[in-house]
Regions:
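Phosphate-group recognition and catalysis centered on beta-loop-alpha active-site segments
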Residues: 1-226
Length: 226
């Protein structure tokens, strides 16, 4: 079963130190989020505002990377760029959550000339995912919320023929609705769509999910799953 470390957790969130530790522990699949600074540098960050991690009330897209670098994460760690992550771990599989429209534009610029085999891209914005598919049809992408709903309502025939380049990264449930159903698993298997479930932090749950036939899990606590 494939284990994705969620933002490098349980290490310091979205830092190079966290991903280095995960790699040393044998994790080869990284899940992260990106935002673009005002000068187009892609940094690993879940929130658009840096207050939670730095105590400073600033929006990433409104400041240059040089200025962002002056605000340490947790008072200790450097901001990690997508460049740094990829350069440090060229063999890692990296799932990238694109957090904003300006970030999407910067990501397209960043991706030019790069090999795309080790990247998978997702977003809660179906519009962004559709834009990625249009520009890079061979780049693996996550199912959009619309596509997940089509599967759950047995309208999966409306999902286009490029679904083999996609993967499903889903919770077991969302807002009281069961997502990981037998129907969902069956359709994904028929369409050769791998399923990864988030966020799974116990070995018992991971084992139960594996028995259902999923490909792997996204976790905040990979050591308990090794």
């Amino acid at each position: 079963m494939i284990i994705w470390t969620h933002r490098g957790n349980p290490g310091p969130e979205n830092t190079l130190d966290a991903f280095k530790q995960a790699w040393e522990d044998g994790i080869r699949h990284f899940e992260t989020d990106i935002h673009a600074t005002s000068d187009g540098v892609l940094v690993l960050a879940h929130d658009s505002n840096i207050r939670r991690l730095t105590g400073v009330d600033l929006e990433i897209q409104e400041i240059a990377f040089k200025d962002l670098s002056n605000e340490s994460l947790y008072g200790i760690y450097k901001w990690c760029t997508l460049d740094e992550l990829v350069d440090a771990f060229p063999a890692a599989q990296i799932s990238i959550d694109i957090k904003s429209d300006p970030t999407l534009d910067a990501f397209f610029q960043w991706l030019k000339g790069r090999k795309i085999e080790n990247f998978v891209v997702g977003s809660f914005s179906s519009k962004r995912v559709d834009a990625v598919r249009k520009r890079y049809p061979l780049l693996r992408t996550a199912l959009t919320s619309r596509e997940v709903l089509l599967i759950l309502t047995r309208m999966h025939f409306l999902i286009d023929s490029h679904s083999a380049n996609r993967f499903a990264m889903i919770p077991v449930k969302s807002h009281g609705l069961r997502i990981l159903t037998k129907q969902f698993i069956k359709v994904c298997k028929n369409k050769k769509i791998e399923i990864f479930v988030w966020t799974v932090n116990s070995l018992d749950e991971a084992i139960s999910l594996k028995q259902l036939g999923i490909s792997g899990v996204v976790t905040d606590n990979y050591p308990v799953l090794l």
